[in-house]
Amino acid sequence: MEHLDVGPLKTARGTIKLPGSKSISNRVLLLAALAQGETVVRDLLDSDDTRVMLDALGKLGVSVEGQGENAYRVTGTGGRFPNTSADLFMGNAGTAIRPLTAALALQGGEYTLHGVPRMHERPIGDLVDGLRQVGARIDYTGNEGYPPLAIHAAPVKIDAPIRVRGDVSSQFLTALLMALPLVESAGNVTIEVVGELISKPYIEITLNLMARFGVQVARDGWSSFTVPTGVAYTAPGEIFVEGDASSASYFLAAGALGGGPVRVEGVGMSSIQGDVRFADALNRMGANVMAGGNWIEVRGAERDDGKLHAVELDCNHIPDAAMTLAVAALFADGTTTLTNIASWRVKETDRLSAMATELRKLGAEVEEGADYIRVTPPSQWTPPAGGIDTYDDHRMAMAFSLAAFGPVPVRINDPRCVAKTFPEYFTAFGGITA
């Protein structure tokens, strides 16, 4: 197996220009494809997941022209894809398969969607149930509740609120929100969220971007959303993709652990991404944090031993960046508890189980619950036997690069899995650490 040896590291300092946000990139591509008019998308993330969306849109007949320097000109279809049948490979891109499933279910065509084996283990049943409430015909061609999917032409009828669970993945709600304006009947449709909505900041991203394309959604708290139907998305002409706030978290944490200063450019206080609030969590742990509209800078904790403060933190608002906190907890002065992270279990891997397993390899004491993880730093660090396994999960690989600030070298297995969102991550990380 390919591996990369990192550390032990002592210092981190420098400036990083972040790649585009995955969550924003794939939402913007789909909205631009569905809109009326042309959109030039700038600073699009170049990664496996965005290529999955670009390939799918091409197979659906959408004109997408590369302009160089991660810019693309998307010619909108006015809500109807030219191709009424397609076989689409979705890789392991949840941000592609879920919104596309909803959009295609309302197109009146015949489509199949499938992916890598892990994608076929990631739940989609709650979204399918929601779409069936408006008459969509969707069949499971493998296990019930999971991809692969076969979507068939069917008349869509909305005569009651749509109910969807919010406690498994916010992407189900995002998919419905983005697709329902395509329904041709004039009026509004209400989505009622059943249970506690997780990952609320990702819904805020969705609503913000829909508004940029001319569709306003009204919400009653986080339990009810009213979506206009029979309206067209309107191309904004040009849109810039923010830097990826989840990816920023690794460099900001490096600044806290390696003294800093480390500055990230591309996200800041004006960001629409929830994971930008990772900087607040670092501040609570004692790191020195400064920020502007489009940048954040972190220096180490101002205490003699350089350790961070242990914290107890509800991470509903930073589900992806919370993984970075779990590794940073190795360097705290006590036990850190991260709660409200049940969504970790249905991501690229079961991240709760994977995180607990790999932290223990380094000597940490870890308690893993249904929706929480409790990390006590190692009393004696141990080199991870066999290396840190990454489970084909980009965020596992990036988060555990930070463990190299400990007293033992860290071997990262399958480091190329970072290509899902940040192909050049280890080059960038190596450029600011020593």
From Swiss-Prot:
Q: Which cysteines are joined by disulfide bonds?
A: none
* Amino-acid positions noted as binding phosphoenolpyruvate in the UniProt annotation, renumbered to this chain: K22, G94, R122, Q171, R351, R395, K420
GO MF term set: 3-phosphoshikimate 1-carboxyvinyltransferase activity
Q: Which GO terms describe its biological process?
A: amino acid biosynthetic process; aromatic amino acid family biosynthetic process; chorismate biosynthetic process
Q: Which InterPro entries does the UniProt entry name for this protein?
A: Enolpyruvate_Tfrase_dom (IPR001986), Enolpyruvate_Tfrase_sf (IPR036968), EPSP_synthase (IPR006264), EPSP_synthase_CS (IPR023193), RNA3'P_cycl/enolpyr_Trfase_a/b (IPR013792)
Q: Where in the cell is it found?
A: Cytoplasm
Quote the EC number: 2.5.1.19
- What's the catalysed reaction? 3-phosphoshikimate + phosphoenolpyruvate = 5-O-(1-carboxyvinyl)-3-phosphoshikimate + phosphate
- Positions binding 3-phosphoshikimate in this chain are K22, S23, R27, S169, S170, Q171, S199, D320, K347
Job of this protein: Catalyzes the transfer of the enolpyruvyl moiety of phosphoenolpyruvate (PEP) to the 5-hydroxyl of shikimate-3-phosphate (S3P) to produce enolpyruvyl shikimate-3-phosphate and inorganic phosphate.
The name of this protein is: 3-phosphoshikimate 1-carboxyvinyltransferase
Source organism of the structure: Ralstonia pickettii (strain 12J)
